[in-house]
Amino acid sequence: MIQERILELTEYGLVTGLVEPEDRRFTINRLLELFHLDELEDEVAAAYAKRTPMTQESAEAALEGILNEMLDYAAEDGLMPEDTITYRDLFDTKIMSMLVPRPSEVIKKFQALYQISPKEATDYFYKLSRDTNYIRRYRIKKDQKWTADTEFGTLDITINLSKPEKDPKAIAAAKLAKQSGYPKCLLCKENEGYAGRVNHPARQNHRIIPVTINHSDWFFQYSPYVYYNEHCIVFNAEHTPMKIEKATFGKLLDFVEQFPHYFVGSNADLPIVGGSILSHDHFQGGHYEFAMAKAPVEKELTFKGFEDVKAGIVKWPMSVIRISAPQKERLIELADKILLAWRGYTDEDAFIFAETEGCLLYTSPSPRDVEES
């Protein structure tokens, strides 16, 4: 019965902290309106009150089933154009939006927790992003993950299976749909709260946190398709193309100064080998330590004029140079020197060319804050 599912989802919101006790009636009424219902029957409410209360764990486990039954009802009642994965995802995001705090409330709480510690702030925001179903826990569980021991360390291997397959009806509808440039891409700030359409995912349950990076406005969010713990995305407030340059190193280091428990990195600014959304300047990070970060330095290096910076070639199957210093300005200067040298480097005997038919050598910088032992 849909009324019982409405009570279940409201309890889910209360248990996870998305809904305050004072907002219980309000949330129930919003859900009734969404499903074109005029009332909550007294008998249903009385019977539900006798049930065993949810816990955080049982609430998480129940969410997928609650939403599926709500979606089945919506499909039968004609509240969705088609009963397909695409339309179900659009509608269940709308359902969850009834529980999600306003952006101003999320930002205010994040900033208050940040004053206690950056980790408390990100812990809150990561939990929120999962509880709102922006990160779909039940789909993430489908991902295949394992480790492999190699001479370079224990590597993480992931096959992402959480992205839903496009259904034929949605593909056909997307071709016929009016083309829109709003939002300009999947990263733009305008996605926050957006209802979506057949060719763009719904984001009513999506929240972003403003951060200042290198004296400019950026935003912080989590990836809906989590590849590792607290997989986050840091993106420019403006829809501007990715570009690896000297300023990039300053931006990356600025972020890890603000969130020292996170790493952050930039994909290359080239197609195929680089980021999947090159049209919007962004970085990716998280609360995780990959094998490359643990790999030892197999050969120490000294750069002229940078004798105060520790440097070395990392034991890794690809070319990796690790540099460290107490002053970030020194790291920025040396990183830029290495970048410029690499982009102009050619070794024909090793089949390395600075440029071939317009394709350039690429680099992927990734800093983290490490305390010296």
List where the protein language model places each region:
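Glycine-rich, often proline-containing surface loops adjacent to acidic residues and nearby aromatics
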Residues: Y227-F235, V314-I321
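Terminal catalytic/cofactor-binding subdomain
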Residues: K127-I233
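Conserved small/polar residues in nucleotide/adenosyl-binding loops
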Residues: Y362-D369
